[in-house]
Design a protein with these regions (language model features):
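N-terminal leader segment of winged-helix/HTH proteins
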Residues: 1-31, 78
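Short, locally clustered residues in the helix-turn-helix/winged-helix DNA-binding domain
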Residues: 14, 42-49, 109, 136
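N-terminal helix-turn-helix DNA-binding core of bacterial DNA-binding proteins
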Residues: 22-64
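Short, hydrophobic-biased segments on the C-terminal half of alpha helices
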Residues: 54, 72-73
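Charged, amphipathic alpha-helical coiled-coil/dimerization segments
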Residues: 73-133
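C-terminal regulatory/oligomerization modules of transcriptional regulators
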Residues: 1-4, 125-141
């Protein structure tokens, strides 16, 4: 059975994502967080009022609502995030970055940036720009 070009590309992209996630999580472990937790803190830090509905956060970090809940529970226990009821609707669960989460996010952003540079060091600036455009198109599609 012939393997399609699309299949081969997706296998390479999946392996690349796994490599990046493993390397970034290892680097971020000195801050006590994983790459997925970093992405949650990053998204919350960038959000208006530094809070989001749980479902919007899940979508922003490409997790299911139950997956983001499983991720947030330990983060809440160690004080990185807090959960709040929505001002307009108490049934809506909001997640906010806590002060400790802001500190960890700021400190870990330096590590994330350094590791990102190392991971992409062999790729030219033009290729990085092209890859960024391709990634944006794939994420939208």
């Amino acid at each position: 059975m012939a393997i399609s070009e699309a299949t081969e590309l997706l296998v390479k992209l999946t392996n690349l994502q796994a490599k990046f996630q493993k390397t970034l999580t290892a680097s971020l472990s000195v801050h006590g967080i994983s790459v997925t937790e970093y992405l949650v803190l990053r998204r919350l830090d960038q959000a208006p009022d530094k809070k989001l509905r749980r479902i919007d956060l899940a979508q922003a970090v490409c997790l299911t609502p139950s997956g983001v809940t499983r991720l947030l529970n330990p983060m809440e226990k160690i004080g990185l995030v807090s959960k709040e009821a929505g001002a307009r609707d108490a049934r809506v669960s909001l997640v906010a970055i806590a002060p400790a989460g802001e500190t960890i996010y700021r400190e870990s952003s330096v590590t994330f940036a350094d590791t990102s540079r190392e991971l992409l060091a062999s790729v030219s600036k033009n290729d990085r720009e092209s890859l960024s455009r391709i990634a944006e198109a794939l994420l939208k599609g």
